[in-house]
Amino acid sequence: MLIPTQIKSLRQYFYPCLGGILGGISVSTHFWLIFMPISLFILWKGSERRIANFCWGFFFILISHSWLYDLHPLTWLGFSWLASLIIAILILLFCAFLGGILVYLWGLLVEIILWKEDVFKMKILSLTVKVFFLSLTWGIGELILSQTPFFWIGLGESLIPGDIYLAGLARWIGASGLCVLQILIGFWIFYIQGRWERKLYFKKIFLLGLLVFIFLHLFGGLTTPIKRNYEYPVAIWQTNIPTREKLKINDEFIEEKLSIAQKYALSNKAKLLVAPEGTLSNNFYFSKGIKVNTLSGGFRNSNNELRSSLLGFQIGDKSFTSFIDKNRLVPIGEKIPRFLDIFSRGLSAVGGIQPGSDSRFFDPKFTPPLAVAICYEISDGLEIRKAINSGAKLIITAANLDPYPTKLYNQFLSLARLRSIENKKDNLLVSNTGPSGLVKDDGKIIQLLELNVEQNKIVFPNFSSDKTFYTKFGDKPILFLFILFMGLNLFWKIN
């Protein structure tokens, strides 16, 4: 039988783990509205205990990134079944451990700034300054991480489809601002519960917070719709060719399939055909000239280096005449350290590829200017924003998401929808096994193809020059607030 001290000790471990699990489950799901606030409440409640912070971060990443396990089996790349299983599990555990360490470090900052005295006896002004600074620190942390290849999705991008109205604030504050808001909401719940538990007055704080919460949703839901037109029909080709089968497919097969897609595009008077990432092999050459302007994922050589690119073909072309190379590569999966080149080609079918320019602006001349995200690059909102500031009128996202499960598809869709909201731009999606379709400039889905089915479809994207507050100013307001609140914490004696 457990004694009371053992039960208390178990609770100290159990609740942070539960909080991380609930948060991980809520990412890019309809559970967000219930699970994420509870998860962040648990995070704040245990934030004075270092191991609690680590446990929360570890399980948050373990659950939200559990799709990494679906790398297994890698037997098609020459690994044994056991080696494949070990590799997949180790990659997932490493990412979870890294998440735990990052939340642990944030918890140390919370301990230094917040837990030197009783939070529930602090003056409101002092408490507000401290909590805003800690929340902004998390938001800035995600912003910095998003500029590295080790970031996929964080709190900032997690709330679609769970709360599309709160996500609407992204047109003002971006993903990092949404992240800050979520941390603040978690603290508000923690603070109310703590005051209630201590039999302290809390109704005014509860009502004020509730009014702010409602206002944020109303403000996030406000949008000026852009009149839709049907002047630029685009054909999208969801190939449904799994990555593991690409090694068995020759160029003649792809050319035949692409010919069918072109006929479909022409019969529907499409001005452009778009195909997913990695559709065309290196130096692909058509035996006959292309019949419709085409953007297709594929590979090309540059200075004896292999690049994954979106290749542009004008009518009559037999080989590409324009391109934009993928810049953000999946560590180990696509990009391996040069000193390991002789030992491995990485965990991909094509071997290690090299990155291109970091600019996501692409003007193939036969379409209006575009902001292009190739798969993993959809997580980099800063570069997409820069491309739109350079004149891009539409976001095109080409991806290759097989063999991963629906969880990754949902996260990819959540990221794509947030990029649309941030910049008030339609986002045309085309993936080998899905998701493919069209996302409206307010993040709502206009059309989405069925997963894991080969399909050709006509969509009508809007090309728009409109810019949001976030597009114009980016994360500068969040950085300004971070510096302001850091200064207040360091130099202003507010207790």
Q: How should each PLM-predicted stretch be described?
A:
Residues 222-473:
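Soluble catalytic domains of enzymes that build or remodel membrane lipids, polysaccharides, and related
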Residues 2-223, 405-406, 431-433, 446, ...:
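Membrane-embedded alpha-helical bundles of multi-pass enzymes
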